[in-house]
Design a protein with these regions (language model features):
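Alpha-helical transmembrane segments of multi-pass membrane transport proteins
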Residues: 1-425
Length: 425
């Protein structure tokens, strides 16, 4: 009965147009009524406690760092260096988009922000160079979803808080699969570019490459600081977020001098709006998560899937399929917040590596961001590239196919994720 109440309120709330955070609060209130323990004060206290976590402080810092990068000229220079290096290859702008997305992924941690920034810079150039815009937009969107995989990742922070796992280990575990996703996308683009006979850009001189490198070195040094800090144990994810925001602000104002106080004010407002949405969603989900535990929903799911516990591989496949279906119709953050407390006990009982599960969870949900019928990142790229949603879907289809194929490879060869993590550690 608790499952029906939760799903009914969640789907009903979404159907009538409630934001997902309010739909989760509705689920919490309904479960409290059903458990005969409704108390506004308890709900309010749980809501406040849900956002009261030191680890969650990393979110506003990384959001602010991403906003400063876009407004302060860092993103532009990050795109410029790959442009000089590989822009002269056939279909070179496609490789540039993936490389730029991977570099920016190590700075922003947001698929939407990453996609919007790269698309705003490269789509006009691709259109003027007579690239098929739907394929180009599909590639940029597919590169953008690497952002939640490569550190610093906001979804990994939320997953770590929800599951109690080490956020630093999740960050490190995402590096190798994120790079594999980027390599897979570039191979797919190479195959398409060779068939489409795409034009080349003018080859940059060594002087132009050097100038681009010198200009972008300050922006490119930021991921080195973050990864080095984690690897050496110099700072926690929250402290890394603060360092990233301060460093980006320093470079934008002192080195590049492209950010004024007026621009900074707008950046702070934008970061505050984004952070408030994410944090309210996290807090709302904690109310539902607490009541889900009291209603023993994880135990019900565990009992339902208990016959599969003795076959971890089969259980893992079933879980991945369930996440895939949910991820196609729901955004990444609420999917993590809703399913993590339900699935994590079962994963641990089956002896599945929880860090491996966390990485696979986020990869699966990230691909869902470019999978119809919802595809939030598809909506972003459609708006920036001025494409119809249907055209964006057709353009992204081959990349969705290869990314899901890579996900299947990760399911059957978990060492591709586990062994690089052991090497990094």
């Amino acid at each position: 009965m608790a499952v029906l109440i939760f799903l009914g309120c969640l789907l009903g709330g979404i159907a009538i147009g409630l934001p997902i955070a309010w739909a989760l609060l509705l689920c919490g209130a309904a479960l409290m009524f059903w458990l005969d323990m409704f108390d506004v004060q308890i709900m309010a206290q749980t809501l406040v406690n849900g956002a009261d976590s030191f680890s969650l402080l990393a979110i506003p810092f990384f959001v602010l760092a991403g906003e400063i990068m876009n407004a302060g000229g860092l993103s532009k220079r990050i795109v410029d260096l790959p442009m000089k290096l590989v822009g002269h290859k056939p279909g070179g702008l496609g490789y540039v988009s993936v490389l730029a997305a991977m570099i920016m992924a190590s700075l922003s941690g947001s698929a939407v922000a990453d996609t919007a920034a790269v698309a705003a810079l490269l789509v006009p150039m691709m259109r003027s160079a007579n690239y098929p815009v739907n394929r180009a937009a599909g590639l940029i969107a597919s590169g953008g979803i690497i952002a939640p995989i490569i550190l610093p990742s906001i979804p990994f922070i939320i997953f770590g808080v929800s599951s109690g796992l080490s956020i630093s280990k999740l960050f490190m575990a995402g590096i190798a699969p994120g790079m594999m996703m980027g390599a897979t996308l570039m191979l797919t683009w190479w195959w398409q570019a060779s068939r489409l006979n795409l034009p080349r850009q003018q080859k940059a001189t060594m002087q132009e490459i050097w100038h681009s490198f010198v200009s972008g070195i300050w922006a490119l040094f930021l991921p080195v600081i973050i990864i080095g800090g984690f690897r050496s144990g110099l700072f926690t994810p929250t402290e890394a977020g603060a360092v990233a925001a301060f460093y980006a602000l320093f470079v934008a104002t002192v080195i590049y001098r492209e950010m004024t106080f007026a621009t900074l004010w707008h950046v702070l407002i934008g970061a505050a709006k984004t952070t408030s949405v994410v944090m309210f969603l996290v807090a709302s989900a904690q109310v539902s998560a607490w009541l889900i535990t009291i209603a023993e929903l994880p135990m019900m799911v565990s009992d339902l899937l208990q016959p599969l516990v003795d076959s971890p591989r089969l259980l893992f496949i079933v879980i991945m399929v369930a996440i895939l279906i949910v991820g196609m119709v729901m955004d990444l953050t609420p999917t993590v917040l809703i399913l993590t407390p339900v699935l994590m006990p079962l994963v641990k009982e089956a002896g599945i590596d929880p860090i491996y599960f966390g990485v696979m969870f986020i990869i699966n949900c990230s691909i869902g961001l470019i999978t119809p019928p919802i595809g939030n990142v598809l909506n972003v790229i459609s708006g920036v590239a001025k494409l119809k949603f249907d055209d964006a879907v057709r353009g992204v289809f081959p990349y969705v196919l290869v990314l899901y194929s890579l996900l299947v490879v990760f399911v059957f060869i978990p060492d591709l994720i586990i062994l690089p993590l052991k090497w990094i550690n």
